[in-house]
Amino acid sequence: MNSFTQSQRVKALFWLSLFHLLVIISSNYLVQLPISIFGFHTTWGAFSFPFIFLATDLTVRIFGAPLARRIIFAVMIPALFVSYAISSLFYMGSWQGFEALTHFNLFVARIAAASFMAYALGQILDVHVFNRLRQNHRWWMAPTASTLFGNVSDTLAFFFIAFWRSPDAFMAEHWMEIALVDYAFKVLISLVFFLPMYGVLLNMLLKRLADKSEITALQAG
């Protein structure tokens, strides 16, 4: 882990929290849009949410677990309310008008609450697993293990809370199938695309940090 000033950590906390919030909001909207791939039911949210695990793993690797946990706790409450508002306004992918906020939508509220619980569970587990394995000489070990464990807890918790006995008949009937397929796609996408992306971004960020450290050292000298 590198040494950072308090100002750098505050900036990282702000921008990474904003990134997490944007991914959560978009995923909560996209999870309302089911798709079928090779006969298996899943949602578009399977393709957006892995970005959070990529960001969290890079945060733990570069800034350390404490900052990653601060981001999780900073994002949880805002994500709950903003996700409900956005998902109500764009219910089932269609603009409902601002009057949609004047009445309570149980379907959307369950999605927002499920996202709140699943995000906290999945991210805390992701940070814990990654932090335990981050010193392993195999660079891919920590992100792979944290992705597998974090995603399974996040996905199953989310779909159970959001769609078990849901008023949406399709999701109520297929939530378990969709959850398992969603998890499989998340893992596949993460291992095929996000794991290599993690390696590339990690090397790029570490190189930039090393270059900045050298410049700072020269200026100090």
Please name every model-derived segment.
Residues V10-N28, T56, Y91, W95-T144, ...:
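Short helix-perturbing small/polar motifs within transmembrane alpha-helices
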Residues W139-T147, H174-A179:
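The feature identifies polytopic integral membrane transport proteins across all domains of life
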Residues R61, A65-L67, R134-W140, S166-M171:
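Juxtamembrane helix-boundary/capping and inter-helix hinge elements in multi-pass membrane proteins
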Residues S17, L21, I25, P50, ...:
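Alpha-helical transmembrane spans of integral membrane proteins, capturing the lipid-embedded, hydrophobic core
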Residues I71, M76-A79, Y91-A118, D168-G221:
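Membrane-embedded alpha-helical bundles of multi-pass transporters/translocases
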Residues P66-A74, M141-L148:
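Membrane-interface alpha-helices at helix entry/exit sites of multi-pass transporters
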Residues V31, V82-I86, D126-F130, T155-A162, ...:
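Alpha-helical transmembrane segments and their lipid-water interface positions
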Residues M1-F73, L80:
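Hydrophobic transmembrane alpha-helices
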